[in-house]
Amino acid sequence: MTQSQTDLRNGPDATGMFGAFGGRYVAETLMPLILDLAREYEAAKEDPAFKEELAYFQRDYVGRPSPLYFAERLTEFCGGAKIYLKREELNHTGAHKINNCIGQILLARRMGKKRIIAETGAGMHGVATATVAARFGLQCVIYMGTTDIERQQANVFRMKLLGAEVIPVVAGTGTLKDAMNEALRDWVTNVEDTFYLIGTVAGPHPYPAMVRDFQAVIGKETRDQLQAQEGRLPDSLVACIGGGSNAMGLFHPFLDDKSVEIIGVEAAGHGIETGKHAASLNGGVPGVLHGNRTFLLQDDDGQIIDAHSISAGLDYPGIGPEHAWLHDIGRVQYTSVTDDEALDAFHKCCRLEGIIPALESAHALAEVFKRAPTLPKDHLMVVNLSGRGDKDMQTVMHHMETTKQEKH
């Protein structure tokens, strides 16, 4: 057996590669900064004071550990696997994003940075970044595509309330990819005082590994909680994937447990065959974007194709390089779910459990509705409920009205 098949949690290598994916594809001006960040992060990881402070904020500010909840009514409805929900939507700010933001802001402060920049799609990472910047009294600038600003107005207002400046990005389709491009441009011109707080397991090394490490608290807690409740490990894990940080947070602590089946769910939008989707692994090819090599949605000329998903947090045309590698070696199974399937799962979760999930998380739930009924009753399935659905009310209302009109 190769090293890569037995120690799956050891990546990346010193250059930031997970197999053929990852790396540091950045402008020369950024390279010293990236290397400095990697050094600082390695030092922080070994520093008991940093770990202690991180644990304090995770507990008393974020509200961790988040519950691992037995979804009795979902389980009854499916009539198969026993379904547990990892309740990340109960965190401060309503999603998993804060786990990473609290870690990175402590690092930024350690490095003496005074200005924080970030990109956001659904607005949840923007809100979480603005939140931690407010808590530590740092200047905060959020880049957000105009399309996303339109569909996530409540989150834009939240960011401004928290003291952040929200800069609209009109380039491209005005979504996450474009916001990330602008944030990288800002960083290049303000390297001295600025810390770029990336929101997912993408970007140049050390970001994919660093974000994963801060999110891995999800999977570590899940191991302990399920052991306490069921006396054993789960049989399967399910999580939605845009860039892939909530999924990597749940998956990573289980990668070396061969008995645990791992399923990542991409956004199929209108369907993979239509070309209007955000499924980089199921409908993309390898290429370089935002500082790393990964699977991307691109045309024959290598130009990035715009991603589509009803969920603003999933319509990124790439995926974290560690996911690309796990797909490549076959450790994780990557499936996809359409807008309609996600909406159906969204409604079922509301009615059956009294929990309004984010549309991102509803993609994972849709996969559960497909799989759980085919599995035995002693199969333990853990689903990452990555965020709450408050931000999606407008989208769901609009979709319901449109559907109603189409029927008449």
UniProtKB/Swiss-Prot annotation:
Pathway(s) annotated for this protein in UniProt: Amino-acid biosynthesis; L-tryptophan biosynthesis; L-tryptophan from chorismate: step 5/5
Root EC class: lyase
Recorded catalytic activity of this chain's protein: (1S,2R)-1-C-(indol-3-yl)glycerol 3-phosphate + L-serine = D-glyceraldehyde 3-phosphate + L-tryptophan + H2O
Keyword field contains Amino-acid biosynthesis: yes
Transmembrane segments: none
Residues recorded as bearing N6-(pyridoxal phosphate)lysine in the entry: 97
Cited Gene3D superfamilies: 3.40.50.1100
Lyase listed as a keyword: yes
GO MF terms held by the record: tryptophan synthase activity
InterPro entries: Trp_synth_b_CS, Trp_synth_beta, Trp_synth_beta/beta-like, TrpB-like_PALP, TrpB-like_PALP_sf
A Gene Ontology cellular-component term: cytoplasm
Subunit structure: Tetramer of two alpha and two beta chains.
Role summary: The beta subunit is responsible for the synthesis of L-tryptophan from indole and L-serine.
Protein name per its UniProtKB record: Tryptophan synthase beta chain
Record organism: Pseudomonas syringae pv. syringae
